[in-house]
Amino acid sequence: MGLLPTGTGNLLARNLAMVIGDLSKAARIALCGENRAIDVGWALIDDRDEEQAFLVMAGVGFDAAIMAGAPHELKSRLGPLAYFVSGFRALLEPRAGVTLAVDGRIEPCRLVRTIVVGNCGRLLGGLVLLPDARVDDGLLDVVSLGPKSIRGWLVVAARVITRRRHGHRIVQHWQGRTILINSESPQQAQLDGDAIGEVCAMRMRVDRGALLIRVPTAGGSDAAH
């Protein structure tokens, strides 16, 4: 598969060190670049029959509520400010009781704002939410964020900026091949930034090396710097 990343928010392209916004370079990579096998995440929502694929991140809770609360019409009027408006609304919602299972190992029920499961770890602005995530390691990386106050959000921000993974109950990390999230109440969910509505359960697995994608050649001039 070749990528033509024209938008600033193309997180897969950014995680693969692709050039953003230059269609001629992107087309050259798509035609002449190196093949790289990357993992594909699959999510089964509640009792639905079909899995849905994701390549970057899936989320339940606050991050998905931001996506759901910023529809196209609002983004057309406000631009990026739409996400701040949506995020403020989502902050008013209570934390959710969630049970998490990683490779069948059940973690205690916890109150969280959001749980993000990622195949990649890098966000916009160079922030890294999942420091250990690798797009081809056959693992899904998980982070739960459970702040209940402004002070808690400052802890989250500090942990993300410094990429610290251990030592605080508000920000916790795991890795595994299968992830199960069960929420006590319906929560907004998203796959690769697309809101998919409210869910109570999401089961995810990784399909290692399932997708061949064209990337810049090693040492070539088409890589992002």
Segments (PLM) and residue ranges:
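Gly/Ser/Thr-rich active-site loops/lids in small-molecule metabolic enzymes
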Residues: 74-82, 117, 123-125, 131-152
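Glycine-rich nucleotide phosphate-binding loop and flanking beta-alpha elements
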Residues: 10, 121-123, 187
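Catalytic core of DAGKc-family lipid kinases
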Residues: 2-113
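Short beta-strand-to-turn element immediately C-terminal to the catalytic PLP-Schiff-base lysine
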Residues: 43-44, 69, 117-118, 143-145, ...
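Short glycine-/acidic-enriched loop or helix-start segments at secondary-structure transitions
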Residues: 12-14, 126-127, 154, 191
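ATP/nucleoside-binding phosphotransfer catalytic cores, i.e., glycine-rich phosphate-binding loops
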Residues: 102-109, 134, 140, 144-225
